Amino acid sequence: MSRTFALTYDYRCPFGRIMHDHVVTGLRAGADWDVTFLPFCLGQTHVEDGMPDVWDAPASDTGIDALQFSVSLRDMQPDVFLDFHYRLYEHRHTAGGSLRDRRILTNFISEAGGDAAAATDDVESGRPLKVIKSEHTSFAETHGVWGVPTFVVGDAAVFVRLMKPAFGDAALAVSTIDRILDYVEWPEMNEFKHTRIPN
């Protein structure tokens, strides 16, 4: 039976990159997961009182363009999304690349086999930004989501950090995510954290 969950992402988060590396690796290997990728704008969580929300002043945020293009692909070109999603995390965290350069974003779409012009038109329409606002706000209110990466399973939402990516090991990726999902379904354990980072 397919395991259904949602997972927040923002390309600026290094722990998001590690978690999504496991998820993408597992999905590419055929893991029986039904995953909803939820955009969660970390910039919005740092907006000071009296300042406009990111969706009202998107030019002020360093990660919102990347989120908008990813949401466009997720919704309108889903066959392209996973490759773009993985490439963008690697671009940011292994190459230190920019998330604001639209030439880079659209090149990644084209390289993944997508229609970059259609994605750009979608972003320019404002639709993806509205979706980000809606999903970010909704899950913050209904599930108390506050960060990346957070798993959402039914009524439960759990923030989880992994220390190492899967490095292409599909068996490791699948077993890791399945273990996390097992823990999500065990609410009696609320916190489990090493006092020192293991070697």
Model-derived features: where do they sit?
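Short beta->alpha junction loops/turns
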Residues: 12, 77, 125-128
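C-terminal cap of thioredoxin/glutaredoxin-like
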Residues: 3, 20-28, 102-199
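Structural alpha/beta surface segment adjacent to cysteine/selenocysteine redox centers
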Residues: 8, 17-102, 179-183, 187, ...
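N-terminal entry module detector
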Residues: 1-11
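The canonical Cys-X-X-Cys-His
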Residues: 13-16, 151
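Short, surface-exposed alpha-helical recognition segments that flank or form part
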Residues: 14, 57, 123
